[in-house]
């Protein structure tokens, strides 16, 4: 079990990444797209939760990892993917956890829990009012679920 921080290194909700990834008008995202950052410290402190990325090549694409199934504390199931890459000790690890195939599924879900209107920016105030600035991740013991995510208060 490990807490993934939703704030940046300055203690703020990023305006155009993380929970607000879709707020960046200069990239390929939609307004409510979001991801949960996985930092070097997260990987170094929990070797059982975050494994190096797998690379499998097919004729048309290279896939880093297969989709995973997560269950949130409220029972919501979501298909997600470990994405991006960061090198740690000579191996590549994911740098974020996103919903798939639609990146906005995670953003819309979190906004509903935070009572933030769709299309709007998530702020520190929203997280403070909710009572959490992190999401707890754990491996699941249920064979149909890969991970458990907890955002309960």
PLM regions and their residue ranges:
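Hydrophobic, glycine-enriched assembly/anchoring segments
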Residues: 121-153
């Amino acid at each position: 079990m490990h807490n993934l921080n939703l704030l940046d290194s300055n203690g703020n909700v990023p305006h155009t990444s993380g929970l607000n990834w879709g707020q960046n008008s200069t990239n390929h995202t939609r307004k409510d797209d979001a991801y949960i950052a996985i930092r070097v410290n997260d990987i170094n402190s929990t070797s059982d939760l975050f494994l190096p990325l797998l690379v499998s090549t097919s004729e048309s694409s290279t896939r880093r990892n297969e989709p995973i199934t997560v269950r949130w504390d409220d029972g919501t199931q979501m298909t997600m993917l470990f994405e991006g890459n960061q090198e740690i000790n000579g191996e590549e690890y994911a740098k974020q956890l996103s919903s798939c195939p639609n990146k906005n599924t995670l953003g819309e879900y979190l906004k509903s829990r935070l009572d933030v209107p769709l299309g709007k920016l998530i702020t520190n105030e929203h997280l403070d009012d909710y009572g959490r600035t992190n999401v707890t991740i754990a491996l699941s013991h249920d064979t149909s679920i890969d991970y458990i995510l907890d955002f309960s208060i």
